[in-house]
Amino acid sequence: MTANPGTGGRNSDLASAVDTVTARYEAANPASRAQYERARKSLPGGNTRTGMFYTPFPLAIETAAGATVTDVDGHLYTDFVGDFSAGLYGHSHPAIREAVLATLDGGMAFGSTSPGEARLAALVCARFPSIEQVRFTTSGTEANVLALATARAVTGRDAIMVFEGGYHGGTIYFGRESAPINLPFPHLIAPYNDPEEAQRLIRENANRLAAVLVEPLQGASGGIPASAGFLEALREACSGHDVLLIFDEVMTSRLAPGGRQEQLGIVPDMTTLGKYIGGGFSCGAFGGPAEIMTVYDPSRPGAFVHHGTFNNNVFMLNAGAAGLEKVFTPPVQAALNAAGDSLRASLSELAARHGAPFQATGLGSLMNLHLQREPIHSIRDIAPKDPRLRQLLHLDLIDRGFFTTRRGYITLSLAIAESDCAGLIEAVDEFLTHHGHLLDSAPPE
């Protein structure tokens, strides 16, 4: 395909390319389309997890093994979604499977504490020095809700500070503004990676701020790392004004044994965890120093009540402990994130060689593909693009056998091999060869 000199020509070529890849996708996936239509009758939009939707209809995955998923039409894909970082161990890792089967044989839903509860808690506390004590929840969302509620209760203040582009769960989500179904906590929204503005807002609102909640890398908004200087500025301002600093390490805890906080040497007052911590089962956790967490000790007068039927789900506890003890050891963790750094560097080299508006942001095994040249330090830096460009890239990669996300987010699992990464690099190379000239297409008016 020859590039046309004008924007109008590029947009015409883009329409043709998108129509072609979409038609091929539709023809190849009749069973996924049928599943989507059936699901729409009982589920709004055909799903119960908004991020799973994409046009013209999403693939319906039926089985998975190792680093691959298979859809209802029988197509096998290399999985670069990694369940948005929850699928760290790949699909049915032997050590996780063994723990799950042993748990199944031993019974479930005890209605009591179990040895697995203290076992997983001890493993978490050993990895995160800032977490002296921890409590479990059923999701990262719930962990963040409880951390914020704890901060508000122990400080006696009601407001929280979050950041543009922050995602802390389905009810604590901030793009450029607060989402309609967010919990009604009084809040301030500050620009991400702007240390001076963040310090100013903390200083001017210290009398009502209970906590500052921040992701060391914003996943949902595009794999955008926080600079060390930004996080250090938050630590300094929070310490100076008795505001609790909460690190949402639901995703970034995979970057080092003690998470991103260990890598940077910045100690938060509280930390939230989730995703892979439960070994692939629904899980969340929040923790911090004993002086804060002791408010949940039910043997103490006036203790805070934290119920939850599945907080100590034995499958989550035992699978999570097996994963941390037997699989995700520090050397394995380092190798996984080195592989991610290598993949991201290779993708950047491709962009430079093709002269294409394309880049991969992120840290370690967490990354996001962007269709622009300009550096990205916050959601404000993400240029408006014709959404058909993302559709073109996404469906093209699916057509080549790579299961990815529409927004370009990629997380590596331990099952991903060097050859899988090489295959993805080759697929992106071919995409840029055939369609790179379209990536400068003007956004729709």
Roles of regions detected by a PLM:
Residues I266-Y296, N312-L317:
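Active-site PLP attachment segment
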Residues D341-R344, H354-L392:
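Conserved PLP-binding catalytic core of the aspartate aminotransferase-like
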Residues R119-A211, Q218, D341-R344:
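PLP-dependent aspartate aminotransferase-fold enzymes
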Residues L76-V154:
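Glycine-rich loop-to-alpha-helix module at the N-terminal edge of alpha/beta enzyme cores
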Residues G323-S348, R380-P387:
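Structural signature of PLP-dependent enzymes
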Residues L14-T63:
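Active-site-adjacent loop/helix segments that line or gate small-molecule/cofactor pockets in enzymes
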Residues E215-A228, D242-L264, M270:
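Conserved PLP phosphate-binding loop immediately N-terminal to the Schiff-base lysine helix
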Residues T2-T7, V327-P330, A338, D396-E445:
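PLP-dependent enzyme catalytic core of the Aspartate aminotransferase-like
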